[in-house]
Amino acid sequence: MSALSYFFAAYCIGWVISHSILVFKKLSEVST
């Protein structure tokens, strides 16, 4: 596995985590 694909995988994982956190915050704001 090359360094570039390694970086790309880490970037995708970080993007998904950050967006899921944002969605979770919005959902918790709406529910309250």
Curated annotation (Swiss-Prot):
S-S bridge residues: none
Compartment annotation: Virion; Host membrane
GO cellular component entries: host cell membrane; membrane; virion component
Membrane-spanning parts: 4-24
Chief location category: virion
UniProt topology in membrane: Single-pass membrane protein
Protein keywords: Host membrane, Membrane, Transmembrane, Transmembrane helix, Virion
Family classification: Belongs to the inovirus G9P protein family.
Described purpose of this protein according to its UniProt entry: May initiate with G7P the virion concomitant assembly-budding process, by interacting with the packaging signal of the viral genome. The assembly-budding takes place at the host inner membrane. In turn, G7P and G9P are present at the end of the filamentous virion that emerges first from the bacterial host.
The protein's name in its UniProt record: Tail virion protein G9P
Organism phylogeny: Viruses, Monodnaviria, Loebvirae, Hofneiviricota, Faserviricetes
